[in-house]
Structure formats: C-alpha cells, structure tokens
Amino acid sequence: KNEKEYEYLEMCSSNRVAGIILCSGTVGVNEFQGLNVPLITIERFLENGTGAVECDNIQGGRLAAEHLIAQGCRHLIHISGVHETAMPADERAAGFCEVCVQKNVQYQVVGTHAYEYNHLEYHEVLEQLLLQHPDTDGIFASSDLIAAQLLQVCAKLGRKVPEQLKIVGFDDVNIASLTTPPITTIHQPIKEMAATAVELLVRAGEGQVVPSRTTLPVSLVVRGTTERKTEGEDDKAL
C-alpha cells in the first residue's frame, strides 16, 4: 500500500473512528482488526469484513458483450484486470465470456499487469494488442480509462472507431463523455453505492446485523464508440 494509505490507517487509529468505509483494493483487512470497528467495503468483498457494497459486475460484462455482438462484432477482446490479483474486473470478464460462449462468438480475455494498473498507463500494451490482432472488431475494456487510452492508440494506428473497431468501457466516469468519439460504457451507480455504504455503516455501528453483500444494478450507456449518432442526439441509457 502507498504512504497515503499508511497515513489514513494511523489517522483511524489515533482518532478512534466509529467505522470505516474501505475503497482501496490493496489494504489488507488485517490492518483494521485492531481497531475493532465496523468495516464496509466498496467493490471488494472480504470474508471477515462487516459488509460489502458492489455493483453487478457480472451483468455489466454480459451487457457489454451483448451490445458489441448486436452491433455486428464477431471478433471480441476483453481487457481485464491484473493477472495475479482478484479484482471486480474478474466478474466482468465472467459475464462477458458467458455471453460470447452462448452466442458462439470468437473472443479472448487479455489480462493486464500490476505496472499498468499502478501507473494508469496502458498505451504500449494496447498498441501491441491491436497490432497482434488486426481482425478484432470489438473490445470491452474493464475501465473507461483503458477505453480512453485505447481511443488514442486507435488514432495513432489509423483504426477508425466505431467503423472498424467498437469499444465499450466500464464505470461511466467523466472522461467517457469527453473523448472523441464519446465512450459507450457500463454505468456504475457510484453515488448509490456510496450512500448504501454509509447507511450500512451507521446500522452496523448501532449494533444491527447488515447483509454481507449488497449488489446494485448497472446499465448500458450507448455513445459514439459503438454507434453513429445524429447531431444533437442525447446519450441513450438502456
């Protein structure tokens, strides 16, 4: 974990916090055991945590695959999480693969490495991926950040999006609507997840039993990386 996370742990200990909401994927739950307070995690399930709030990552993977296939894609790639680390992206990959198998569509899942994940830098691996698989016509990226960098690589290589390659991201963060073309993505209900985490933490602090896992639905937001839009047409949420 990084220095900031150490500082936050020290702050929790010195201030005798009443509860913790954990979003980090790197801090171990054992770090909090000595605090003896309720622990709610977001997008991370811990066997000995108080409760976890997650989005429906499996359904997100399904929606992405179904949309790419419906748009005519037949050679799909999913850019997933870090090979050696359990991540929410693993469930997204599972949903994606499930649909590809059902539809008998050619696909592969490509994992990333800790370096790319930690440095938020995917350009080199994405360029190599496109050069090695020139017939790929649809890519589901496990985050909008990866999808945005993929757009930059496509521009460099002269691959037209969405005419030659269609892209779906995940999260629906601000960058997804700011790229050219804007990114079709799976909307993650972050505000609702945060509000649910706070509610569960308060209930747990009052001594109530809270569910070990709470899953919120995701939705597909169609933008320019998979569909041509007429001028002035709003984003369509399905």
Predicted regions and their residues:
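Short beta-strand and adjacent tight-turn residues that come in two discontinuous sequence segments
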Residues: 22, 78-79
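Glycine-rich phosphate/diphosphate-binding loops that line cofactor/substrate pockets in enzymes
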Residues: 65-76
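Flexible loop/turn connectors
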Residues: 127-236
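Short acidic/polar active-site loop segments enriched in Thr and Asp
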Residues: 18, 73-75, 137
